[in-house]
Amino acid sequence: LIFAFLIALFIRTFFFQPFYIPSSSMEESLLVGDRLFVTKFTYGYSKHSLPFSPNISDKRILFSSPERGDVIVFKTPEDNDTDYIKRLIGLPGDKIQMLNGVLNINNKPIKREFIKNDFVLCGGTKIKSNFYQETLPNGKTYLAAYSEKNSSKDTDVYLIPQNKFFFMGDNRDCSQDSRYLSSVGYVDKINLVGKAQILFFSNNEEIGNLFTFWKWHKSIRFNRILKFIK
């Protein structure tokens, strides 16, 4: 039993770690009730690769730079303990700004195409939103939701420091992310936990949970099981 525990701990620390999505900040890419695997080796290792993040070193070994557009789990700079999952938007040295409701990277608006008008979950309430397919400078595409009411208000320019990264949720007006400098802000490379890779299970908890087995045929999102994260 102890040997099995040590094997599981080794895999969790160095290879794959499961995570659960509790909020709607990344809808529609990630939904509340999604369960996914994060690869721990993609960006190398730091103290946050270990259980309970022991304060043993402020260095990162075998570091490999993340790519713009990656969906990443990281520890929030506010407490270096809480796990957040967001999309990487800004790299060290970048200038990031929301201007006229459009994401600008290094003084250029990104390409985007209107896809649909639909409802998106925000704090338990469904908000009417416009969905756009956004294309980052490296060609990475994803679907982002903008509330009809808020529409991501204009911001100052964020200048990303060295060894720091800027993250945003795909559900733009329902995401606590790097735009909020006092609570999230710029994320140090030490705080990166891993890259979100694949969904292994998904359950719509508005319909039922894992104990209400008679609702599984409706609550389990079978079309999301073993789906790669883009």
Question: What kind of feature is each model-predicted range?
Answer:
Residues 1-14:
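Hydrophobic membrane-insertion alpha-helices, especially the h-region
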Residues 18-19, 34:
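Secondary-structure boundary/capping signal
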Residues 19-29:
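N-terminal signal-anchor transmembrane helix
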